[in-house]
């Protein structure tokens, strides 16, 4: 987050109008987002197509303006006509969501040939079958996307090589590792499981926890819930678990537990202890 903010601020200093809306998005600053949108709109309306894709993005996600897929498509199309690979891909992605695959494919092919990784990934996953016997097309485009450091492609290749007839766990781990380095949360979570269970690699609790925390910091809900469960266990053991009280409190709150919920859990724990003691007394 800090690095992204610094990059956006520097881009803004260098005159990149799109950085203003990105900075507003990062900082959740409505005023800055609106100012950024207005600056982009003014630029594009005056004929500067350099910002057409960014304006389409603002409309698609309602950043600084009301959400409008129709307007998003309009500006993505403007960007695509300028031979902008990102604009082509964003327009194709919206066509895919509307199940208009015939319109999406030529845009993706064109962007993919320009070596845009996400276009290559979308082409592989929407127009070829990775899990069929005839999967050469899917693998071709996924591998090209992976060569362009596309995190989703790296993750999908990791999944592909971790199961089925083509299983190659060493290769899968390599793909997951590369995807995790590019902040793919599901890849980080997979690595956490791999190191926790000692699959192919030596079992390593420290690495398992490292990748679990990385996934959680990237807002992976499954990872957050797992860390919260560990934090609750640590809390129940009066801090005898694998994290200190401050960290435990952080993950518990991150998972959405309220003070009321924690009080109820404490009551349940007390009842469980009482029942356990009674059972012991009965058996003596």
What function would you assign to each model-found segment?
Residues 14-16, 46-48, 61-63, 82-84, ...:
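Short helix-capping/linker turns of helical repeat alpha-solenoids
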Residues 20-29, 54-61, 89-97, 122-130, ...:
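Hydrophobic face of amphipathic alpha-helices that form TPR/SEL1-like repeat modules
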Residues 30, 66, 98, 130-132, ...:
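Structural motif corresponding to the intra-repeat A-B loop/turn of tetratricopeptide repeats
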Residues 226-284:
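Terminal, low-structured helical/coil segments at or just beyond the last alpha-helical repeat
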